[in-house]
């Protein structure tokens, strides 16, 4: 008996597929499910009354109608539950894909020139794609631009492209990015990666082609002069993050990929650490063999004792400031007058601190003892009573006898 083919389709309106029958004229259900996974039977439309009629199924075997298979188109039957689940899955996937494609956000444009209008902004960004909204923020009182604005595109791919580069608008470089709604301490996900251990024969185009296999590359930067590393920027931050920590082979050389730390993170750390990062040099100095009544002491007078003291604990100074202070002390006494004035405002001073302070050794100090053979007028530093020995006698005579200066307690 010659093999017969019957026409089977998933839907009446679709193009049918021919399926072979067995020698006895029956069709195995396994033959149908091989072409239509999940199928559980066949049905056809009765030519007489146009009603759908099912094909008899016995133990996995489909039997032909009374008049044979004929030239009819047989439609595949699916279990209702499976059909419903498949439809829901397809609909859900379609919605997710649609949302992913159409989701766009307002982008903030920073650094706009004062003269830029909303029409100027729209004309510029229209070169990238369809613009559905532009706004230049203005001062409510003056009506002048605040130097930033917002733009929204109709297409998500256009938005990604615009965010991946800087823009020259009316003669000024501007940045276009998503408004940062995160807290200052929360790190932003970077789309840029650092590629270390590069060789000089690796060009920017070769790096672009290599990394394009992982995702869309929007920029490749190799610093000049060559320093054995490069930066690669992706359109998607997830691609960049997935490559961080990987060792990749480019032109037979192993390169290491890590996160490119944004500059603003370093600035933020500097702000947390203070203006001068590093250990504080307040309460530190050059120890000497004898105690001092203050961290920075200066005792001057014509055969006068005592000492005027000044504590540097209130000042957080670094080595550069310390060196500058030392140079100023050696070259001019004007610096001492300034420090004395600051002492009177911020720190304790006394005319006779010697007894109490001499009993404890403070290793962080500067001391300077100067004697001049002069009894001329005093530029007062310390107590008004010069007899107490706590003063700064600034009279200089031609018959200077001696000067002893030392850094000590």
Curated annotation (Swiss-Prot):
It comes from the Eukaryota. It is found in: Nucleus; Cytoplasm; Cytoplasm, Stress granule; Mitochondrion. Residues 341-387, 395-409 have a biased composition (Low complexity). Residues 105-200, 191-262 form the RRM domain. The keyword rRNA-binding does not apply. The keyword Nucleus applies. Keywords: Biological rhythms, Cytoplasm, DNA-binding, Mitochondrion, mRNA processing, mRNA splicing, Nucleus, Repeat, Repressor, RNA-binding, Transcription, Transcription regulation. One of its GO terms (molecular function) is RNA binding. Residues 260-302, 341-409 are annotated as: Disordered. Residues 261-274 have a biased composition (Basic and acidic residues). Its main location: nucleus. GO terms for cellular component: cytoplasmic stress granule; mitochondrion; nucleus. One of its GO terms (biological process) is regulation of protein stability. Residues 281-292 have a biased composition (Polar residues). Homodimer. The RRM domains can bind to both DNA and RNA. Probably involved in transcriptional repression. May play a role in the maintenance of the circadian clock periodicity. This is TAR DNA-binding protein 43. It comes from Xenopus tropicalis (Western clawed frog).
